[in-house]
């Protein structure tokens, strides 16, 4: 009804006429807007849409080509939809459209040549962030004549190929990247065939670390040749290191962790998801002497003894991601509570921790839930809506919640009550994911009221992820009627992560 009345009001305003029989808005079109306002409107569009706007008229073409709209540019077709047909066209774009305004640039392999890099160095003095994608490369261009490279880079992301050796290129740029603060080396973890045996060290990390002494954030993601010696190499030269991520580097065992913390006194964030950590190496670290605040040890094989030893000695942990670990059981969580080291905890991820009981989780949340901003208790069949209904009144500060498991349960989840409890108790909620099988979700004809309450009470909610099914369609339609088109998403294409809580999250974003 409200939607209908809004439509009537809009149509009435459009039909309004004066005594002369003409609407006062008849001559009000977008053409009347000044260039400054149009430029601001265009800034909300993607570059692909801006290029389409340039075909409308000469004035819009002039605005679309304003360099202020081209500060952050991706020329990777699979990411932005933009494709530059030739190197000559790109050279023209760099000088005519990008120029001093360009801050961030992504280049695919076919556009990474010494001519392009020379032009960027000469015409784009304010370029500070760059991504170079070599993943699809079968052969590099000739860089023997490369004499210049953007020298003000603070952020560099290199997507590595499995078979192309980078040393010929890297050797030419070492003198230009000593100001780097953030380095991403992205491997081919998601594309690698597990049966392949040959592994090539396609980039020389030991030489790279000597050229980048000012690194604060290092992200080595899914690189199959990265091991503990490479971590040791970076720690020997990067004394300002604050964040180290080696997620899905399965050759990392933790053998150099003790040395890492002894050298890197500023290290606050350590992300080691999917690595091959060994308990004896982890227990050798002097955790009580570190200033570590953020730790990810998801999907590692650490023992219960090791987990107790580590967690009870880290003095001020704010972020813990420790899902999919068989050793994380009731005794670990109990010992951690008794140590008193949970007082600073803001984010807890215990996804798929099947050896934790309802009782110990309830005790932990009762004591520390009021301070938690992210709580991930998903992937456990025994954690149902009953436990969540008990702990939600405590999670007053929650910004991120993930609950439910994909496997079919023998019990049903009363989702209307759950939505009502979330809306009532979590006004700061920004991200929510329900992973339960849609066949387990039970809702009534009054579900719209519970969804309305969630939408109205949780005004900061920007992402809600549900499994595909009737309830997903119901919630999606509700939010779309309220013009919140992008909030409700499907588990097949979106997952909620607690990584938003990490202090250096913006620096860790890549690809």
Regions found by a protein language model. Name each.
Residues 1-18, 24, 82, 89-91, ...:
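C-terminal capping region of solenoid repeat domains
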Residues 1-221, 227-235, 243, 248, ...:
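N-terminal adaptor-interaction module of cullin-RING ubiquitin ligase components
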């Amino acid at each position: 009804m409200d939607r209908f009345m809004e439509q009537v009001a809009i149509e009435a305003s459009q039909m309004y006429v004066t005594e002369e029989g003409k609407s006062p808005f008849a001559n009000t079109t977008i053409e009347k807007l000044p260039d400054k306002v149009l430029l601001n409107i265009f800034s909300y569009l993607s570059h692909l849409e801006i290029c389409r706007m340039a075909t409308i008229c000469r004035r819009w073409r002039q605005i679309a080509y304003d360099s202020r709209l081209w500060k952050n540019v991706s020329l990777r077709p699979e990411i932005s939809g933009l494709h530059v047909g030739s190197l000559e066209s790109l050279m023209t774009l760099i000088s005519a459209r990008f120029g001093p305004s360009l801050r961030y640039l992504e280049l695919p392999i076919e556009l990474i040549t010494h001519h392009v890099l020379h032009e960027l160095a000469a015409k784009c003095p304010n370029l500070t962030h760059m991504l170079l994608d070599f993943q699809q490369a079968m052969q590099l261009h000739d860089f023997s004549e490369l004499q210049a490279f953007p020298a003000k880079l603070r952020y560099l992301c290199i997507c590595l190929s499995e078979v192309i050796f980078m040393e010929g290129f890297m050797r030419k740029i070492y003198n230009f990247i000593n100001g780097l603060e953030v380095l991403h080396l992205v491997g081919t973890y998601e594309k690698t065939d597990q049966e392949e045996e040959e592994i090539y060290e396609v980039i020389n990390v030991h030489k790279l670390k000597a050229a980048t002494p000012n690194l604060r954030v290092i992200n080595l993601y899914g690189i199959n040749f990265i091991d503990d010696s490479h971590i040791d190499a970076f720690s020997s030269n990067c004394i300002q290191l604050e964040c180290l991520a080696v997620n899905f580097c399965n050759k990392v065992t933790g053998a150099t962790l003790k040395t890492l913390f002894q050298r890197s006194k500023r290290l606050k964030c350590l992300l080691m998801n999917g690595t091959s950590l060994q308990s004896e190496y982890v227990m050798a670290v002097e955790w009580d002497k570190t200033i570590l605040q953020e730790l990810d040890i998801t999907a590692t094989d650490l023992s219960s003894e090791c987990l107790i030893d580590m967690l009870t000695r880290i003095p001020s942990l704010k972020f813990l991601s420790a899902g999919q670990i068989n050793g994380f059981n009731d005794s670990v969580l109990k010992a951690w509570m008794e140590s008193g080291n949970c007082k600073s905890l803001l984010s807890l991820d215990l996804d798929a921790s099947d050896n934790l009981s309802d009782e110990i989780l309830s005790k932990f949340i009762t004591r520390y839930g009021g301070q938690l901003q992210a709580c991930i208790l998903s992937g456990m069949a025994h954690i149902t809506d009953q436990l969540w209904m008990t702990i939600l009144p405590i999670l007053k500060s929650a910004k991120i919640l993930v609950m439910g498991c994909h496997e079919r349960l023998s019990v049903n989840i009363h989702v209307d009550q759950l939505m009502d409890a979330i809306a009532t108790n979590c006004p700061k909620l920004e991200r929510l994911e329900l992973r339960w099988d849609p066949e387990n979700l039970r809702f009534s004809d009054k579900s719209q009221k519970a969804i309305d309450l969630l939408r109205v009470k949780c005004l900061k909610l920007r992402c809600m992820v549900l499994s595909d099914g009737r309830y997903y369609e119901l919630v999606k339609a509700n939010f779309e009627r309220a013009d919140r088109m992008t909030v409700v998403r499907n588990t097949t294409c979106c997952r909620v992560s607690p990584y938003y809580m990490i202090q250096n999250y913006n620096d860790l974003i890549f690809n």
